[in-house]
């Protein structure tokens, strides 16, 4: 629900955080930008949960992708997720993200077995779009 990661893909560093943690926590407005998808749509950069968190949801104010802008300030976790899905997720992945959001309950809905299913599916199938939550629930 809006944590950000800038970590490793397979064995190659994609990006490093450097001093970005200090910058985002001390900046007036923290903005993170990335394309909504990579590898010609095989990978969504907007996922239910990241495997490694560099920036928690408390440090992320705005997310920008090629699909749009999600202003996350003054929103609860579900509202943050909704804003990201509606405004930043690629249409190829929006329904999968909505489906994941419905799996959990409470203030911060999390379906633990399905939380990293996008990543697991990519490792197994080579395409995050093939994610089937029935395998993880």
Question: Where do the protein language model's features map onto the residues?
Answer:
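Metallocofactor- and cofactor-centric catalytic cores in central/energy metabolism, strongly enriched
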Residues: 10-13, 21-137
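Single conserved hydrophobic/aromatic residue that forms the stacking wall/gate
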Residues: 1-5, 9
């Amino acid at each position: 629900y809006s944590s950000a990661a800038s970590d490793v893909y397979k064995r190659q560093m994609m990006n490093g955080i450097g001093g970005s943690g200090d910058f985002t926590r001390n900046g007036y407005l923290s903005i993170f930008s990335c394309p909504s998808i990579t590898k010609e749509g095989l990978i969504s950069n907007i996922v239910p949960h990241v495997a490694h968190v560099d920036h928690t949801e408390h440090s992320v104010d705005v997310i920008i992708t090629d699909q749009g802008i999600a202003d996350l300030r003054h929103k609860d976790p579900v509202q943050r997720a909704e804003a990201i899905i509606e405004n930043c997720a690629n249409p190829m992945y929006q329904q999968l993200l909505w489906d994941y959001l419905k799996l959990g309950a409470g203030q911060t809905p999390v379906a633990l077995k399905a939380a990293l299913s996008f990543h697991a599916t990519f490792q197994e199938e080579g395409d995050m779009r093939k994610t089937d939550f029935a395998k993880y629930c």
